[in-house]
Amino acid sequence: MAEEKSKTTLLKEKIMMTEPKGVKALSEEEIKKADSFCDGYKKFLDNSPVEREAVRYTVELAKKAGFAEYEQDKEYKAGDRLYYVNRDKAIALVVIGKNGVKNGVRLAIAHIDSPRVDLKPNPLFEANNLAFFKTHYYGGLKKYQWTTIPLSLHGSVVKLDGTRVDICWGDDENESCFCITDLLPHLAREQASKPMAKAIEGENLNVILGSRPYDADSDEKDLVKLNVMAVLNEKYGICEGDFLSAELCLIPSFKSRDIGFDRSMIGGYGHDDKVCAYPAVMAALDVEMPEQTCITYLTDKEETGSDGNTGMQSDFLRFFIYDLAKQDGVDGYRVLSKSTCLSADVNAAFDPTYASAYEANNCSYINNGVIISKYTGHGGKYDTSDASAEYMGKIRAMLENNDILWQVGELGKVDGGGGGTIAKYVANMNVDVVDLGVPVLSMHAPFEIVSKTDVYMAYRAFFTFFDTKE
């Protein structure tokens, strides 16, 4: 006979939260689904390191799923599936719902830019018979992490005649790669005494390119630089002046890998925020006939403030929704006012090695599912959207009622630093929004870590958000 529970135990079970079971709550079948889903994610991650490549790969996935390119003057009906590209660096995937847009749209918005090292407009120089690129780092990175690792060159160059050349050098193991040097420890006493942020100066993130002269017998200057340019000219048909109209960057040249003896995690470059972008993309591809129109939007420039005409502060998405509203005979601002959004962005996973940076009761943990961040920002909740209790309640109920692993947390301790997402820019359009994403270890490093089950829970969250009637 089972022992009768005490009054205290019964009350505790009724009104107190229980410790999350995390991955232990999942069946073997569910874990296998997560592992299988992440096979596709790793392909996406490896093929989408920068924005243009992420958009191209997403278009390929969308076309295979029956999506067609958006035509501005075309009439669309329920069930139609379309994509709309903004300057090759942002993309919207849309599934027209049974009710069109008159009752609002459901948005899942992720970003596809990641911290990296960009080239300066005049990057190529030679010093002491070595050729280098001058760089300007992009986003919030720890500069020392980018030295002495293999780097690949990615991006696009527009030549004087207007033709665009896409460049990718260093990803293939049989290709050469590039590197930023560091000072040997034997001579680094002064460097080692500096604060971490100053030990490697941004101006010293010079990328080594070559060491052999074009013609050893020539009296011309800068022959190593000339040799580098000759190689680029032969392969891509570009001249040194073409760097002035180029978008080129250095990113880690290693591919994603399973992490751990149990292969339960994925290490790779750009989890922030491809680990939310891919689940949001797949949710849009998999939803069939939703009640409300669903839009997955992959945006650019989040790591530097979401500025520019491909960032979230651009009016591109707003104007697109206005066009959809016009077709349904309603005002665009009314559509936005009835819309809801999941700002699909990552948060910092608790790291026991650096436990003092976190407040253990209010942070996210690997394998505990998606992390809902009611607000981000810094200090006294500056520079953030703070989701309402009502909207938090709706998202909480959606996750709980569909057995999706989830947790709520902040980005570290109060006054310990801070960060932001695109949520505040969505909120400025009068849209209900909250951040929901995947916990990440070593965020903004060249090699970040996520849990496979958390990635799959993100997919389930976005799909359920799109597919649920209310």
Regions found by a protein language model. Name each.
Residues 1-470:
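N-terminal hydrophobic/helix-forming segments and targeting peptides
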